[in-house]
């Protein structure tokens, strides 16, 4: 599995601000969008381009244009919505596919409770966004859904990832690409990433 820890100074700086314990909802939400945007910039660096001729102010001009690769952004509810706008800044014409997951209290396994996916996933690059890759369960289940619908090209964008989640994701879906602002130390006994960001969903939405 391709794993990219984006170490750009802007990413490191903004992520550091997100780790502050008493950060406001407004600041956390804005930074999630900004870091999501920077991760998207990295994740789309391999998109193919083609030469086309346009009418410029001085006549015909040859330019580069993205070569017909359609994109869908897939936020995992609810926290993933906080990164969605950062992706759309770069690919504003992308379709939005939404997946909702909850954890079964008995099995502790993620269970999908909502999905609204692009109808032509087999033709699209799916960019899945979720602030945290902790155990990897929700991400794996989401990718299972996408592949079941024919999606063949998937990139994952997370703000922080735990080594345990990366290992779990790679074991099941070695063909996906992972882009993260930080690979953190570990998961604690409650399944939280350390040092992590706390509960990203609560911080983005301001509700528990």
Curated annotation (Swiss-Prot):
Which keywords appear in this protein's UniProt record, sorted alphabetically?
A: Allosteric enzyme, Glycosyltransferase, GTP-binding, Magnesium, Nucleotide-binding, Transferase
Protein EC: 2.4.2.9
Q: Which residues bind 5-phospho-alpha-D-ribose 1-diphosphate?
A: 78, 103, 130-138, 199
The activity regulation comment is: Allosterically activated by GTP.
Q: Which domain of life is it from?
A: Bacteria
What InterPro entries does this protein's entry cite? PRibTrfase_dom (IPR000836), PRTase-like (IPR029057), Upp_B (IPR034332), UPRTase/APRTase (IPR050054), Ura_phspho_trans (IPR005765)
Does the keyword section mention Glycosyltransferase? yes
Q: Which NCBIfam families match?
A: PRK00129.1, upp
HAMAP family recorded? Upp_B
Q: What is this protein's record name?
A: Uracil phosphoribosyltransferase
Record gene name: upp
């Amino acid at each position: 599995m391709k794993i990219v820890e984006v170490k750009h100074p802007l990413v490191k700086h903004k992520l550091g601000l997100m780790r502050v314990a008493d950060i406001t909802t407004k600041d956390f939400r804005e930074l999630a969008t900004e870091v999501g945007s920077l991760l998207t910039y990295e994740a789309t660096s391999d998109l193919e381009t083609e030469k086309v001729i346009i009418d410029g102010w001085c006549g015909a001009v040859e330019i580069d244009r993205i070569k017909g690769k359609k994109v869908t952004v897939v936020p995992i509810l609810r926290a993933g919505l906080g990164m969605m706008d950062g992706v759309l800044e770069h690919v504003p014409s992308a379709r939005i596919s939404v997946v909702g997951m909850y954890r079964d209290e008995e099995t502790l396994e993620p269970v999908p409770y909502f999905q609204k996916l692009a109808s032509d996933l087999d033709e699209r690059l799916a960019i899945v966004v979720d602030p945290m890759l902790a155990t990897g369960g929700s991400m794996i289940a989401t990718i299972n859904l996408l592949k079941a619908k024919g999606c063949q090209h998937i990139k994952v964008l997370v703000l922080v990832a735990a080594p345990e989640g990366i290992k779990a994701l790679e074991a099941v879906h070695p063909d996906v690409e992972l882009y993260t602002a930080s690979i953190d130390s570990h998961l604690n006994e409650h399944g939280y990433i350390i040092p992590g960001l706390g509960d990203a969903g609560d911080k983005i939405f301001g509700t528990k």
